[in-house]
Every structure is written in structure tokens, then in C-alpha cells.
Amino acid sequence: MYIEMIDETGQVSAQMQEQITELLQFAAEKIGKQNKEMAVTFVDNKRVHEVNLEYRGIDRPTDVVSLEYKPESEIVFDEEDLLDNPELAEMMEDFDAYIGELYISIDKAREQAEDYGHSYEREMGFLAVHGFLHINGYDHYTPEEEAEMLGLQEEILTAYGLTRE
């Protein structure tokens, strides 16, 4: 999985960015999304507030904003078209590869790590996996959805080695 890391704050270490990249690649393998692409942007509370308002209509900062990429209209080609035109087939693979982007507030990550009594690394990993699952269709609007998403999220974090301790 290709993951573009963007640090708008200048405060996220290369080591942390690498850990988030590895964690998201691990999560992608767990749910069968290895051949996808996404972006992760680290921001402050002011910027995440702007993004939250612009894309979700919610006028406050949050910890992570997940923007799932959904083409406005489905592009459908006949199988023969793709077999006859390798360039078109490659273009369609690339088009289908991009799944979305995350905006993670490092301010909220620090606050929540302290509030929940675990490390900043654990909170950053939690937010990255939580957002990643959202852009892959998981949600928590109903108790059933919440149990599935949070269970998978905890399974990924624990298997990767990011526990609450």
C-alpha cells in the first residue's frame, strides 16, 4: 500500500510517520487492501476544525477526519476494452487504487493520550487505524457496526503491538 505522509505541523517525527505507515500497511493486509493508495495529513486543532467544518459541516475540532474517495460516477468498461488496451487497464487500476485521506490532529492526539492514560504513539496509531477503517467502509452508527469496527480496530492494534499500556 502506498501512503503519502504530509506533516503540516512540522512536529511529527520521521520515526512516527514511518510507524504510522507500517501500521496502516499492516492494517491493509489484514483487510485485503494492500494494493491501494491513501494520504495522511498531520494537522493542528485549527486546521482540523476547518476541514471538519468544510467536509462534515461540524463546527469544532476533532481527532481525525476521514475522507473516503468515491468517484462521482462509476466508470465501466467492457472486459474486451480492457484486454485490447493495456494502457486503459493500467489507468483503471490506478484510478481504483486511491481510497481516501485522513487528517489527524496532533493536538487532539496528545490531549486524548493524556486523558486515556496511554502513550502518544498508541493514540496516533489508534486514530490512524480508526480513520483507515472509515475510508474502507467501516462505521459505528449502530451497535452492530460499532462492535465490528472497534473489534477489528483493537485486533489490528494489538496484533501490531500497540497496546493501551
Swiss-Prot record:
Entry keyword annotation includes Transmembrane helix: no
Q: Which residues bind Zn(2+)?
A: H130, H134, H140
Cofactor binding: number and manner: Binds 1 zinc ion.
Q: Which SUPFAM superfamilies match?
A: Metalloproteases ('zincins'), catalytic domain
The EC number(s) attached to this protein equal: 3.1.-.-
Q: Does Hydrolase show up as a keyword for this record?
A: yes
From the UniProt record, give one GO term of the biological process aspect.
Answer: rRNA processing
Which Gene3D superfamilies does the UniProt record give? Metalloproteases ('zincins'), catalytic domain (3.40.390.30)
Q: One Gene Ontology cellular component annotation? A: cytoplasm
Cofactor(s) needed by this chain? Zn(2+)
GO MF terms listed in the record are: metalloendopeptidase activity; RNA endonuclease activity; zinc ion binding
InterPro entries per the record?
MetalPrtase_cat_dom_sf_prd, YbeY, YbeY_CS
Q: Keyword annotations for this protein?
A: Cytoplasm, Endonuclease, Hydrolase, Metal-binding, Nuclease, Ribosome biogenesis, rRNA processing, Zinc
* Primary subcellular site in the record, as a coarse category: cytoplasm
Q: Where in the cell is it found?
A: Cytoplasm
Function according to Swiss-Prot or TrEMBL: Single strand-specific metallo-endoribonuclease involved in late-stage 70S ribosome quality control and in maturation of the 3' terminus of the 16S rRNA.
Q: Report the sequence similarity comment from the record.
A: Belongs to the endoribonuclease YbeY family.
Please give the name of this protein: Endoribonuclease YbeY
